UniProtKB/Swiss-Prot annotation:
Signal peptide: none annotated. It catalyses: 5-enolpyruvoyl-6-hydroxy-2-succinyl-cyclohex-3-ene-1-carboxylate = (1R,6R)-6-hydroxy-2-succinyl-cyclohexa-2,4-diene-1-carboxylate + pyruvate. The lineage of its organism: Bacteria, Pseudomonadati, Pseudomonadota, Gammaproteobacteria, Enterobacterales. GO terms for biological process: menaquinone biosynthetic process. Pfam families: Abhydrolase_6. It comes from Salmonella typhi. This is 2-succinyl-6-hydroxy-2,4-cyclohexadiene-1-carboxylate synthase. Belongs to the AB hydrolase superfamily. MenH family. The gene is menH.
Amino acid sequence: MMLHAQHMPGQPGTPSLVFLHGFSGDCREWQPVGEQFHGCSRLNIDLPGHGGSAAIPVGGFADVIRLLRATLISYNILKFWLVGYSLGDRVQMIASCQGIPGLCGLVVEGGHPGLQNEQARAERRLSDGRWAERFRHEPLTEVFHDWYQQPVFASLTAQQRQALTALRSQNNGETLAAMLEATSLAVQPDLREVLNALAFPFYYLCGERDSKFRALAQEVAATCHVIRNAGHNAHRENPAGVVDSLAQILRL
């Protein structure tokens, strides 16, 4: 089995760019950024529970990473960069720490390296469980209205929140809930030690107004690019800034 994806061929011999979206996003999430790198082959993936992969069930990160590997093989992607956001980051960081053939480098935007104690994990498990129940049983417009009131999204304007709520409400609440539980930060290992020892290029993008994740970026051995005029969702709030950073990273 493989994940649904959109593939755009590029010039032969160049590494592919593999984009992984955040929770409640889909393969369109990174398109405005990826389109600026038309010389590169690009693969925009739908993670389980989302978009064209909504019907694919998973029990945890191990299943997601197995599907990611199978998808890369099916598209004959042998040399690539992983570029992700939030949930997509956490998937790609775990995959990178475990080792994934052909990986040239890792670009993380607002990704959490993992909680560091059992109390924090227990609190997160409880919080994610409450959100999952809401996704299963309440209208998605109401759930996402509240979702985007969380402190991490404080930099969004009212118009941006409204647009995101409308967009994300097109999802399936049941499959979102299942993916949220399967890949909760509560079940993610603390990756700091392994991330600090990675032997390939590792870059971290974060919005200048995202103080929480700017602090987390300092805890891993990554080169940090601060995106001006942006918060947690930097590639949506300032896509041009993210494109500029990616161009520097990829030397394009």
